[in-house]
């Protein structure tokens, strides 16, 4: 399953979040990072592939003290086309 994770960092947590991200010690708990994009204003989005929501939750728990997130299951074009089949 694919999951879109929108994230934002509160101004008071920017330094610590940047240090944690720069450390390279991020654990994906069996999830596969498809892509991550950063935008001005301390916001961004990730696409992660995972077999279950538990893995996503474990991944997010390492950031929940610094980052606000929303997680949405998503599908690619092939999945969207399958959903249109009767």
Language model segments and positions:
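Conserved, structured core segments of small domains
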Residues: 1-86
